[in-house]
UniProtKB/Swiss-Prot annotation:
Gene label: rplF
InterPro entries the UniProt entry points to: Ribosomal_uL6-like, Ribosomal_uL6-like_a/b-dom_sf, Ribosomal_uL6_a/b-dom, Ribosomal_uL6_bac-type, Ribosomal_uL6_CS
Alphabetic keyword roster: Ribonucleoprotein, Ribosomal protein, RNA-binding, rRNA-binding
Similarity comment: family membership: Belongs to the universal ribosomal protein uL6 family.
Protein name: Large ribosomal subunit protein uL6
Pfam family, one: Ribosomal_L6
Oligomeric form and interacting partners: Part of the 50S ribosomal subunit.
């Protein structure tokens, strides 16, 4: 039995949740997001709260209800507050420049990398070695951050590469003669 599914999702003022069959749509100041409920999950709306419950008592239904509750909570938080992810570029000559919806990355290769941001994600560079990504969609934001990091993931000897700001790189010692 999922403990996550038992907790209600609180809906702040300015956020509306509409359900059309299995489709759930969440609207707020930061945008509109939607997702499909699993067939084993039911959604009940009360004043300022959303309660998810399994359609039938089974282990799989409780698991799906817990997952749906977590996704719905992220949608509500995303359209009301939004999410952000910070990336750091560590290395000589590594820099980033944002031009509209394109992030131009110089990561030590012989050519610059132009990464086109998907719709719903914005980027800014307060310094040349820092990228701040913002979005209402937590899943899309994490995907974009992972794709940018994959161009030059941090190596364990000098720590050079693109890393998340809260990431700790385990360093190795160089081989000695």
């Amino acid at each position: 039995m999922s403990r996550v599914a038992k907790a209600p999702v609180t809906v702040p003022n300015g956020v509306t949740v509409t359900q059309n069959g299995r489709q759930v749509e969440v609207k707020g100041s930061k945008g509109t997001l939607s997702f499909n409920l699993h067939a084993l999950v039911e959604l009940k709306q009360e004043e300022g709260k959303l309660q998810l419950a399994p359609a039938k008592e089974s282990k799989d239904a409780w698991m799906q209800a817990g997952t749906a509750r977590a996704v719905l909570n992220n949608l509500v938080k995303g359209v009301s507050e939004g999410f952000e992810r910070k990336l750091q570029l560590v290395g000589v000559g590594y820099k980033a420049v944002v031009k509209g919806t394109v992030v131009n990355l110089n990561l030590g290769y012989s050519h610059p990398i132009d990464y086109a941001l998907p719709e719903g994600v914005t980027a800014e560079t307060p310094t040349a070695t820092e990228i701040i990504l913002k979005s209402a969609n937590k899943q899309l934001l994490g995907q974009v951050a992972a794709e940018i990091r994959a161009y030059r993931s941090p190596e364990p000897y000098k720590g050079k590469g693109v890393r998340y700001s809260d990431e700790v790189i385990l360093r190795k010692e160089a081989k000695k003669k």
